[in-house]
């Protein structure tokens, strides 16, 4: 459902943006459905979808669930944009940009430029860090679009 890898190499920046994107969408759903944070980490998305449909009598698909997570994240991002948050604020702390001297991640430093480029493409963000108009249309966030692009 969320295309999460089991064998992810944490020392590389390759595919990390997709991992973050999927983790955020999934985690947001857990928050929205009031599922214990610890359970979200161990339950498969398919299990949550099946339980949601059984409890509510709905017949949501995995695509519906993914879109709900995307919509929730985009709404929060747009709200933060309205409060002044932009691409300039999307940065990692200096400590995370310094290579460790030993351990499993020794020598690895995230390629922030690559990560942000891939992440912005996945999220449908423009160079300012705002959701693109077509993304807002696709997610039905017309009021947010009107406020961001007035």
Regions found by a protein language model. Name each.
Residues 1-150:
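Extended C-terminal regions of large enzymes
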């Amino acid at each position: 459902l969320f295309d999460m890898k089991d064998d992810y190499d944490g020392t590389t920046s390759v595919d990390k943006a997709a991992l973050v994107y999927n983790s955020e969408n999934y985690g947001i759903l857990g928050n929205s459905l009031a599922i214990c944070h610890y359970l979200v980490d161990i339950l498969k998305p398919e299990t949550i979808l099946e339980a949601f449909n059984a409890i509510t009598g709905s017949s949501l698909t995995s695509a519906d669930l993914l879109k709900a997570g995307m919509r929730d994240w985009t709404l929060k991002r747009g709200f933060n944009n309205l409060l002044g948050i932009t691409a300039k604020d999307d940065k990692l702390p200096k400590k995370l940009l310094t290579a460790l001297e030993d351990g499993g991640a020794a020598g690895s430093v995230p390629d922030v430029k690559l990560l942000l480029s891939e992440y912005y493409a996945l999220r449908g963000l423009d160079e300012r860090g705002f959701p693109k108009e077509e993304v807002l249309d696709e997610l039905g966030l017309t009021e947010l679009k009107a406020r961001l692009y007035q």
